[in-house]
Amino acid sequence: MSDRVLKEFGDTLLTSGAWGTMKIEFDPEYMIGKRAYPFRVVDFTPFQVTRLSLEDYIEKRCLFSTQDWIDLLIQTVGFNPAHFSERVKHLILLRLVPFVEANYNLIELGPRQTGKTYLYKNTSQRAFVVSSGKATAATLFHHGTTKKVGIIGMKDVVIFDEMASERENASKLDAASIDTLKNYMAQGSYSKDGIELTSTCSIVLSGNIKTDVENHCPLWDYRHLFQPLPEELREDTAFLDRVHAYLPGWEMPVIAPSDYATGYGLISDYAAEIFRLLRRRNYQTHLVARVRFPAGMSQRAHDAIQKTGAGLLKLVYPHRTPDDIEPDELRFCLDLAVEMRLRVVEQLQAIAPKEFQKVRLGFELVDR
């Protein structure tokens, strides 16, 4: 590889790889030490973005109105924003929070064909969809024989698709996986085969729920909204309490062919890399500086609301700082965050009313 190619593209070509065209030179006399290397890459033209600047992305956000920016994000993940209400657009943004917020746990139950799997499969190569069969602890965490780290240790987002399904090929977790996943969702680390491993991977539980499609609400033959989950999960309050947000998938419309994007959005590879860089930024500082939560709220509820709020800030207001973010911008993110966590808490109260008593979830904005 020539010095120029190595300098400009070496960090990408020698790690994750990149699509592009290469000019390869044949020189049988080219040596490195005592070894001949007759084939040498002398030029490379990438098809995709190989270098990007998060600061440039943040600077360009300032040129858009909030509504136009949200529409751009919706278009980027493959949907036509003109076909959706503001509420549906906001729920699509919530689907993106696991991509920008590390160690984030989301559940979405809703009818089929609402674009859940489509979005997760097409947004980033660093997401992995467990779409069928039983997911074992070896596959997810660590393989004791091969010594390979599992997908939760390798990916940014792991999606358990069709968790709430009676189909034979639905995603299922064995007992060992549930115990390990429960600890991981709380701590961001896990022990497997005598090895302690950490990860920033976010977890998404996705599945179906019986829905009144016309009125966009679940059918009321459920005792609680976790009931469609597999038997081993549906009333495991320790597991369910680790979920940061419950996205009401029954509010999402069935996606028609005309609902897919037809205009301009960000290149998917570029957007995926930006999301990955945003994962490394801490936007919870915005909330610590400007928000107070009511006394009596559990630490898990507090953490859940902060993580959802921070994720939405990264998506919609990445250009804001704790000093210049507007109250209405904070309210937009936190109202959604409180609603999504409240849905989790209400189901826990229905499952175990003695363990989970009613507590007010909310927030108060304070002056700069």
Which stretches of residues belong to each language-model region?
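Extended alpha-helical interface modules used as scaffolds for assembling large macromolecular complexes
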Residues: 250, 262-263, 273-279, 339-368
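Phosphate-sensing "switch" segment of ASCE/P-loop ATPases
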Residues: 196-203, 208-313
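C-terminal helical "lid" subdomain and adjoining coupling/linker elements of P-loop NTPases
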Residues: 255-259, 285-358
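Extended, charged/polar low-complexity intrinsically disordered regions
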Residues: 1-76
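Eukaryote-specific, cytoplasm-facing alpha-helical/coiled-coil scaffolding segments in long proteins
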Residues: 122, 269-272, 335-342
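Conserved ASCE/P-loop NTPase catalytic core
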Residues: 80-215, 220-227, 241, 362
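Conserved phosphate/pyrophosphate-binding and hydrolysis machinery centered on Walker-type P-loop NTPases
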Residues: 59, 63, 85-89, 260-264, ...
